[in-house]
């Protein structure tokens, strides 16, 4: 008998219960998340008196960040509070995990405190999957980045940003530039872009920072910025993931900028209305020139703003789905 594979993110009815990866999500499901996010964007308007909705009132959201984060943790906290949830940010360095308690012991103890949702960032690929397998049926898990594997909410907010400025995915050329080998954002973006029907996704970077198998994912590989940026609609820049590198993969930051930094001159090779994105944190003068980061074609701060609405959408959707 053939064993049927079940996506661990989905309920028996195919609804989103956890968000662990963009891989395995349908185009309709991704579009539903983006459409839901658009309903929350107006909550960020500075002239709006009330910025909360009661969708998660009475629910407890635990942010478990085993790696440092500023944007992601903060936007998840804002998103949960705007949904009226009670939010607890666990200080990992001061917690029992730093004293030898296992990951699952930590989860079990927090679950005993009536947790309804865990937002998890962990250095080990697959950690959110492990947690999702062991939580109670009513508890939801959102992956806020696991090792090199995935960063699904970043991928979704990137898709929201692209859709906001470009409308139609099916006639775009998108270039992802930099340290793709170590980037969970790149993996999530590639899965999302190909699922949404983007006809050409390009990866640009030195051979030492590009993983094998990109072509099998439908990605065109370039080792030259000048060649890879020609005629693109969207440029997604990635930082060097020095904390995940072992050994000297590059000569120096200066040499990297010389070969792969996004300058105004290189950006001019893209379409005149191309947009520039970056998941942050940026290393100015390494992968991106300040003139580009702060320029008219940059939508980097828009990504941060849209990230709140996208994370609200994800939390609201998963909270409504149980087996």
UniProtKB/Swiss-Prot annotation:
Carbamoyl phosphate binds at residues 71-72, 121, 151, 154, 280-281. Belongs to the aspartate/ornithine carbamoyltransferase superfamily. ATCase family. It is an enzyme of class 2 (transferase). Pfam families: OTCace (PF00185), OTCace_N (PF02729). Pathway: Pyrimidine metabolism; UMP biosynthesis via de novo pathway; (S)-dihydroorotate from bicarbonate: step 2/3. Heterododecamer (2C3:3R2) of six catalytic PyrB chains organized as two trimers (C3), and six regulatory PyrI chains organized as three dimers (R2). GO terms for molecular function: amino acid binding; aspartate carbamoyltransferase activity. It catalyses: carbamoyl phosphate + L-aspartate = N-carbamoyl-L-aspartate + phosphate + H(+). The gene is pyrB. The lineage of its organism: Bacteria, Pseudomonadati, Pseudomonadota, Betaproteobacteria, Burkholderiales. Its EC number is 2.1.3.2. PROSITE patterns: CARBAMOYLTRANSFERASE (PS00097). Catalyzes the condensation of carbamoyl phosphate and aspartate to form carbamoyl aspartate and inorganic phosphate, the committed step in the de novo pyrimidine nucleotide biosynthesis pathway. GO terms for cellular component: cytosol. L-aspartate binds at residues 99, 184, 239. Keywords: Pyrimidine biosynthesis, Transferase. One of its GO terms (biological process) is amino acid metabolic process. This is Aspartate carbamoyltransferase catalytic subunit.
